[in-house]
Amino acid sequence: MNLLDNVDAASLRTDVPDFRAGDTLNVHVKVVEGNRSRVQVFKGIVIRRTGGGIREAFTVRKVSFGVGVERTFPLHTPIIDKIEVVTRGDVKRAKLYYLRDLRGKAAKIKERREPRG
């Protein structure tokens, strides 16, 4: 079992910022179209983080042209170029599935204030 942990540790990303459910992220995703490759930004609210180690994943939700779009990313995949935390959200749940049913201002998440010091 220790051998598997060593193999997993070699594959983990080191440039992952600290984020949790309720935070707004910019996820820079590499998209391959034919023989060309470009970077596409997916901006949305993290509604969940699941798993652990190499199998850890997170789901980001955004509303695009009135349609809710959710995308689940493995955290340690090479497809992700970088992750930026735009704002920190103040929520009391680890899974924010209730946002799927909310519209407009009701779906807005309060910003978490960091203590000075």
UniProtKB/Swiss-Prot annotation:
| UniProt keyword annotation of Ribosomal protein present | yes
* GO MF annotation list: structural constituent of ribosome
GO cellular component term, pick one: cytosolic large ribosomal subunit
Q: Does the keyword Ribosomal protein apply?
A: yes
Which cysteines in this chain are paired by disulphide bridges?
none
Output the SUPFAM superfamilies linked to this UniProt entry.
Translation proteins SH3-like domain (SSF50104)
Q: Which Gene3D superfamilies match?
A: 2.30.30.790
Recite the UniProt keywords alphabetically: Ribonucleoprotein, Ribosomal protein
Q: Which GO terms describe its biological process?
A: translation
Q: Tell me the PANTHER family matching this sequence.
A: LARGE RIBOSOMAL SUBUNIT PROTEIN BL19M, RIBOSOMAL PROTEIN L19
Which family does this protein fall into?
Belongs to the bacterial ribosomal protein bL19 family.
What role is this protein assigned?
This protein is located at the 30S-50S ribosomal subunit interface and may play a role in the structure and function of the aminoacyl-tRNA binding site.
Could you identify this protein by its name? Answer: Large ribosomal subunit protein bL19
